[in-house]
Each structure stands twice: as structure tokens, then as C-alpha cells.
């Protein structure tokens, strides 16, 4: 019995070392791949980026590119507009350091309970990184890279700069990228004139723009 226990402990110890080595190599590779990444707000917003939009079942529904857009300063937006996006997308945006680990743990628990991956846990900072620097593949490597780059972003930008950049590049459906273009498209007015209901409508589009679009024909 003691011999079996001893062998089990040795095997466990060896496996732990192997996993640790693999983990170190994995993280080191990601750090090397991201070490030269720098952030420039104007370049992020103005850069042309090919974007694929997928339906809930993973089918490609739109393939388009986002060109340079007029930057809408955060200071031009009403508090109600800003608060709508924070309330829906990231309530603790100004409190966390880019990654909300408590939110991630809660989402993982809920997904396990529901046997699905319906609930996400990405902060606004993570969403910005995912939409401007990474692909849409759902792999551990991409997620870890997202976290690493998010940490770098939080050091390079202020919270207001991150939120401003996010609002100027995020996809709102119907080919609209950025709050100014979405506001003009859906409500025929500049973003600075959005009221509370209009702001809430736009904020609600981000999670599933193809489903919640105000222009969608729900009777068909």
C-alpha cells in the first residue's frame, strides 16, 4: 500500500512539473508575441480593418471593412449615453484594471450550470482588444493573449481614452462602426444629441446587433 502511494505521489509530482513547464512555455510564447504591440488611439480608430460578422450558429452573415471615422470625444457625449453603455457592458469599468476576474468566475459558473457558453465576461477593455487586435477564434491562446494585451492597454491609456476609443470602433450592426455612425444611421442625429432611450437602444445592440437592430423586420 505504501509503495502504491509512493508511486502515485511521484507520478503526481512529475505530472505537476510537466504541466508547469508547459504553462511557462505557453505564457512565454504569448509574452514574446505581444511584447512589441503598442497602442495609438488615433491609429486604432482610423485604421481599416476587415471584420467578419457571424450569426449565433457561427455562420458568416457579413464581411465588411471599417474605414477611418470621425472621432467623437467622450466629453461630447451626454452622461446618460455614457452610463447606458457602462451599465450594459461593464458596470465596474472604472474600478477594475482591465480584467474583471470576479465576473469571469461568475460567468464560468453560470455556463457550467447551463451546459452552454451563453454568458460572456469580457470587460470594455477586453472587447476593444478583441475587436481591434485579435481574431474571433475561441481558443485558450487567444483568450490569454487578450488578457495580456488588455493589461498593456490599461497601462498605455487612461480609462476615458479606452472608453472613447471603444465607442468609436465598436460594431452596432447594419454596417455601422462607432457611435457617431450608428447614431446617424438609426436616429438621424449626431451622437451628442442622443436621448436616454436612444442611448440604451444603441448600447443594447452591441451584444447581438443582428438580432436587436431597430431596422429589423420582426414580423417577417
Which residues does each predicted region cover?
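Juxtamembrane regions of bacterial inner-membrane/periplasmic proteins
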Residues: 2-220
